[in-house]
């Protein structure tokens, strides 16, 4: 994405409000066999390439509880009690990255909001991340990813598992890395 000089002077014009998140032009959104809509590779994507960047407003857990009632899940946790996502129905679509969960993901988080390809990805593959790399919450859900290594049940506490910490070393959200470091 090329940003004009006027956008640098006026950051509000850099990205239209309907596009709070970035999705690579090599990806498209369509119906997913996992759940709802998903993100899919429209062209081959190389390992390490940026696939999407989560955007939106930053808010605390209390605000999350308030907006989740009407907007459903649309946020990503970025710190102990902070999240990034939409605050209104008008922001929801533009803040989505449409990355469903998989126990064998092909994209992973770098830092807090940037998602990169974990391996070379072929056209047509759904672009998924393991929610254990971004979430610290109390939820529990049945997993429908279909991977041979599927955990069957995914929880907001899966980041605590040593096997997943090892598997996703370098691709855990910053705040989870800090929590793990403090516990060591």
Residue map of PLM features:
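N-terminal cationic amphipathic segment used for targeting or macromolecule association
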Residues: 5, 12, 39-40, 115
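Short, basic, low-complexity termini and linkers enriched in Ser/Thr/Gly/Pro
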Residues: 1-17, 184
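Catalytic cores of histone-lysine modification enzymes
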Residues: 19-107
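C-terminal SET catalytic tail plus cysteine-rich post-SET Zn-binding segment of SAM-dependent SET-domain
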Residues: 101-184
